[in-house]
């Protein structure tokens, strides 16, 4: 006698209705929920209810294991997206991962987190190779150097910042000289009349 497990439990409809479990993640978005900030059908609606806080978040670590109890009220993403996965803490601490390449968390290169050296971007860093910041070598943009680059920030070449290099001294006129100029102006006006 062969024993088969049931594919659905008695409480499965309750989970689908109350927590949206087991529903197709690719189902269409509910228009009523998007337009009116609420669906009249509530939890019995077969369409997807997406809150605006859902967008651009990291994936819920509990949902990945099938243990998230918040359902649609969860502030994290319930979608398998490799770019939005939480960062692998083991990789952060040790520089390698024992689960790699099967690790479902994000592995970010530690060198990419080092901030850019502003002095090197301007043209010269006196710290040289001992600098704790990142030195990125890029060719300067010829168009930018001659005055204007139409590509702007999306240009693949460097646009060096010349902040603070040309600090000219501001010359203020002497108050006595200003008074002399005013008297000269008055005499010219009198002569014209």
From Swiss-Prot:
Its main location: nucleus. InterPro entries: CPSF4/Yth1 (IPR045348), Znf_CCCH (IPR000571), Znf_CCCH_sf (IPR036855). GO terms for biological process: mRNA processing. One of its GO terms (cellular component) is cytosol. It is found in: Nucleus. SUPFAM superfamilies: CCCH zinc finger. It comes from the Eukaryota. A zinc finger (C3H1-type) spans 24-52, 54-81, 82-110, 111-138, 140-162. Keywords: Metal-binding, mRNA processing, Nucleus, Repeat, RNA-binding, Zinc, Zinc-finger. Gene3D superfamilies: Zinc finger, CCCH-type. It holds the Pfam family zf-CCCH_2. GO terms for molecular function: RNA binding; zinc ion binding. Component of the cleavage factor I (CF I) involved in pre-mRNA 3'-end processing. Belongs to the CPSF4/YTH1 family. This is mRNA 3'-end-processing protein YTH1. It comes from Yarrowia lipolytica (strain CLIB 122 / E 150). The gene is YTH1.
